[in-house]
């Protein structure tokens, strides 16, 4: 399990990609992280390969996503950490070439962008919310994977 600390929290305030109010067209493998982001994609006809959500926004405001996912997985991931269970499930899901899968988080999904970038293949599009700004769209690259490895080394491991 990795625990968030002040140093990494400061780094994570900066988006990993470009921030959009409306996303451009997206091709290839797509992972969405966050309820509002996933809802926006689905309402625009974009079905991610994997959606990671907890049915809340801003920690406690319920979000209704009227979509029936093809396959659903659940894991626990407490606030401020990346649980071993979440890491193992994301690692497994990164090997599946399917669409319309959901990973439902009991706890908080905010930090799970980190293992998604670590385990999903290069050129995967990852979209997550940047609170009060929009959605961040990034393509996984080797350079980004190296940055994530450094962040993980800077986190407290238990």
From Swiss-Prot:
Reaction(s) catalyzed by this protein? Answer: 3'-dephospho-CoA + GTP = GDP + CoA + H(+)
Q: What is its EC number?
A: 2.7.1.237
**The keyword Nucleotide-binding is assigned to this record:** yes
Fetch the InterPro entries from UniProt.
GTP-dep_dephospho-CoA_kin
Which keywords, in A-to-Z order, does the entry hold? Coenzyme A biosynthesis, GTP-binding, Kinase, Nucleotide-binding, Transferase
The family note in this entry says: Belongs to the GTP-dependent DPCK family.
This protein is called GTP-dependent dephospho-CoA kinase
């Amino acid at each position: 399990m990795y625990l968030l600390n002040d140093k990494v929290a400061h780094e994570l305030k900066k988006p990993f990609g470009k921030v959009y109010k409306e996303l451009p067209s997206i091709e290839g493998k797509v992972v969405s992280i966050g309820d509002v982001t996933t809802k926006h994609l689905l309402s625009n006809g974009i079905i991610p390969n994997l959606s990671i959500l907890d049915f809340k926004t801003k920690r406690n405001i319920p979000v209704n996503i009227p979509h029936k996912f093809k396959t659903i997985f659940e894991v626990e991931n407490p606030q401020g950490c990346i649980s071993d269970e979440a890491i193992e499930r994301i690692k497994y899901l990164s090997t599946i070439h399917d669409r319309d899968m959901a990973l439902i988080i009991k706890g908080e999904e905010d930090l799970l962008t980190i293992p998604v970038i670590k385990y999903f293949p290069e050129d995967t599009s990852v979209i997550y919310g940047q609170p009060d700004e929009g959605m961040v769209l990034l393509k996984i690259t080797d350079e980004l994977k190296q940055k994530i490895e450094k962040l993980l080394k800077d986190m407290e491991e238990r």
